[in-house]
């Protein structure tokens, strides 16, 4: 289960709406399973159908996470025209060529903008190509 403070879910939805019609992406970091920082990451694809995180952003974020002794807890992105469920592309991007997970402990948070007046947000694990929905508790 992932527990997420309301202001983080609000920020994810706001980010998605601001980037619409393109997908947004970002990272949640923290300690002991508790999110303490949300990082918006530039989607270098500038696409409504896919995202790729800017490598320069990732270098800065990874350094700050290491310096703060945090963990990468979740990766988030939006789906602008489909449900909040990992696509085949999302699964492929979450795995190495040998099929093993790149971040097996990380949650993947997806926000769907199919209904922009009421976006849907869900959390998943993607482990070795298998998707499992996880409870997302907003506090």
PLM regions with names:
Residues 1-72, 83-139:
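Conserved beta-strand-loop surface patch within small alpha/beta domains used
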Residues 77-81:
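Histidine-centered divalent metal-coordination motifs
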């Amino acid at each position: 289960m992932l527990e997420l403070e309301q202001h983080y879910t609000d920020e994810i939805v706001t980010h998605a709406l601001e980037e619409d019609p393109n997908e947004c992406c970002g990272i949640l970091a923290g300690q002991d399973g508790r999110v303490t920082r949300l990082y918006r990451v530039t989607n270098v694809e500038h696409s409504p159908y896919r995202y790729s995180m800017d490598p320069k952003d990732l270098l800065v974020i990874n350094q700050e996470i290491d310096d703060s002794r945090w963990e990468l807890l979740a990766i988030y992105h939006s789906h602008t025209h489909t449900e909040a469920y990992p696509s085949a592309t999302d699964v492929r991007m979450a795995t190495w060529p040998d099929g093993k997970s790149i971040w097996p402990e990380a949650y993947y948070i997806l926000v769907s903008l199919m209904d922009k007046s009421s976006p849907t947000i869900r959390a998943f694990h993607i482990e070795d190509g298998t998707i499992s929905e996880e409870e997302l508790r907003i506090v």
